[in-house]
């Protein structure tokens, strides 16, 4: 199986456990990119929509491209009632967008699965002049200051966490966007908290 499609085999679990994004992030993104009715937005690989509804709620013309058929179907079930929602089940790398152009293209932990040169050049070419590329990423690498506890947790991971499919990701350097015509590259961080039950 192609690794890029692994989450398509477990859409319900992906939807349940995938981290959500900060409300402040979306408020600032919508303001920065001036997203509102009449603006055209493309989301790359929305999965099950963890970063979709806040953008849909702006009234913009929302368009998504999702590689996974099961994930695309879930997106249609969740957001098909929105008049401004549209999604295509296709591979961004080879998809022909025709004369479509966008005011913002965004990716919530997806763009890094696309070869860097294709990701940056194709998104740049699809943007209207002055358009925005937003790349969202979640990181769950908080390290407790309790070193003894941290080391014990790592021992448990080493002993029991053996995924069926090894996690492989090519090198993707977000700041390299400036090598493809992008300007005003900046990084912002938003912190949150996730809680799980012992069963989870």
What residues fall within each predicted segment?
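Conserved class I S-adenosyl-L-methionine
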Residues: 1-36
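Nucleotide donor/acceptor-binding cores
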Residues: 38-39, 100
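Class I SAM-dependent methyltransferase SAM/SAH-binding core
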Residues: 42, 48-95
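A short acidic, Gly/Pro-enriched loop at the edge of an enzyme's catalytic core
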Residues: 94-105
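Short catalytic micro-motifs in class I SAM-dependent methyltransferases
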Residues: 109-110
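A short, conserved alpha-helix within the catalytic core of class I
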Residues: 113-123
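Conserved catalytic/acceptor-binding region of the Class I
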Residues: 124, 129-194
């Amino acid at each position: 199986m192609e690794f890029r499609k692994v989450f398509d085999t477990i859409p319900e679990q992906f939807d349940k456990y995938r981290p959500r994004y900060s409300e402040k992030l979306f408020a600032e993104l919508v303001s920065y990119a001036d997203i509102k009715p009449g603006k055209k937005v493309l989301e790359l690989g929305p999965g099950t929509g963890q970063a979709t509804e806040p953008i849909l709620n702006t009234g913009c013309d929302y368009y998504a491209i999702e590689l996974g058929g099961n994930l695309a179907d879930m997106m249609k079930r969740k957001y098909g009632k929105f008049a401004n929602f549209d999604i295509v089940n296709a591979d961004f790398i080879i998809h022909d967008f025709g004369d479509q152009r966008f005011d913002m293209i965004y990716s919530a932990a997806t763009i890094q699965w696309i070869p860097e040169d294709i990701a940056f050049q194709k998104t740049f070419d699809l943007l209207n002049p002055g358009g925005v590329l937003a790349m969202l990423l979640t990181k769950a690498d908080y390290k407790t200051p309790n070193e003894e506890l941290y080391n014990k947790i790592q021992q448990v991971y080493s002993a029991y966490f053996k995924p069926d499919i090894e996690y492989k990701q090519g090198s993707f350097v977000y700041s390299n966007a400036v090598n493809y015509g992008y300007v005003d590259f900046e990084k912002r961080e938003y912190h949150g908290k996730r809680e799980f039950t012992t069963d989870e």
